[in-house]
């Protein structure tokens, strides 16, 4: 295909150093801050980074809940909570003068309902996720959250669960998934045509708004309605033992096709902000201030 692939090699990067790569696939910068800093540099230098490091840096689960709501996609009721603890130097009577406290826990619970899910707004991999069945459970886990920013979310009592792998803002693979077992099921006709179409269309709407070329999203289906309960997974689990060999083969091929296409057909990322384009008209009369537009794949 005329494309070479290798592991990226970087270290002590200079500000004017060119990036030797056309495309970089990032699956680790959320754990290694230096990599994230380098990837923003690489994007400015002209590389296509999967996923866009500027969007990934700005993303969180509460933003995504707000985004889904604005896009008209069914999403569980969600509240972001003030941090339970703060770094040294934060003076509660000065630094937190803008914060309403104590929290109205009963009002919060009345909004999201019980049971509900308390989770880290920036978390993943099922870390710091708690299903709470009483207000006391919510407060208990919140009190143990430390410096994390937590969101409290309505628990959707689902009768069907789907996890989609979305690649290249074009291809979506909806897989039957059981979060209780944390296991995929190889069952190709697990949704009606109508439900399947809606899940795929809503998944594409979300990844195009976020500008993510590699993501997974979880849909809890209740009474035939798919609710987007988690779609902040820019480094999704792609292990063969998780996906099963059948779906793993699909993901590998789709990832390879996407990467080769991006190498041969570069797509500038520095000015991409898919979600901003969707809402530009609400404050600027339908036009982005400088008249620019971000490309959205067909």
Task: Specify the residue positions occupied by each region the protein language model found.
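Active-site nucleotide/adenylate-binding loops and adjacent lid/helix of ATP-dependent enzymes
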Residues: 43-46, 54-161, 193, 197-201
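Short, solvent-exposed loop/turn segments at secondary-structure junctions
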Residues: 30-31, 56, 122-124, 157-158, ...
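A structural preference for short, hydrophobic beta-strand core positions in alpha/beta folds
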Residues: 7-8, 51, 77-80, 216
């Amino acid at each position: 295909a005329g494309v070479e692939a290798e592991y990226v090699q970087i270290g002590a990067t200079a500000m004017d150093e060119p990036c030797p790569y056309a495309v970089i696939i990032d699956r680790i910068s959320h754990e290694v801050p230096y990599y994230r800093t380098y990837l923003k540099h690489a994007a400015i230098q002209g590389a296509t980074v999967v996923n866009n490091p500027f969007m990934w840096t700005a993303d969180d689960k509460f933003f995504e809940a707000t985004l889904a709501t604005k896009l008209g996609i069914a999403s569980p009721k969600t509240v972001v909570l003030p941090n339970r603890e703060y770094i040294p130097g934060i003076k509660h009577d000065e630094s937190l003068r803008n914060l309403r406290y104590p929290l109205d826990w009963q009002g919060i619970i009345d909004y999201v309902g019980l049971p509900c899910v308390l989770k880290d707004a920036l978390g993943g991999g099922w870390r710091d996720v708690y299903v709470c069945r009483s207000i006391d459970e919510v407060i208990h886990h919140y009190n143990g959250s430390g410096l994390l920013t937590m969101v409290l979310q309505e628990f959707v009592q689902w009768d069907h669960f789907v996890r989609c792998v979305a690649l290249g803002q074009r291809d979506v693979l909806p897989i039957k998934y059981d979060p209780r077992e944390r296991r995929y099921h190889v069952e190709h006709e697990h949704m009606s045509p109508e439900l399947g179409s809606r899940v795929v269309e809503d998944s594409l709407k979300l990844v195009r708004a976020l500008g993510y070329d590699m993501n997974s999203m979880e849909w809890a289906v209740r009474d035939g309605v798919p609710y987007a309960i988690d779609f902040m997974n820019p480094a999704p689990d792609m292990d063969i033992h998780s996906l099963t060999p059948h779906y793993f083969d699909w993901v590998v091929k789709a990832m390879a096709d996407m990467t080769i296409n991006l190498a041969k057909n570069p797509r500038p990322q520095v000015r991409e902000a898919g979600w901003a384009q969707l809402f530009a008209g609400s404050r600027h009369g339908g036009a982005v201030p400088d008249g620019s537009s971000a490309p959205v794949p067909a």
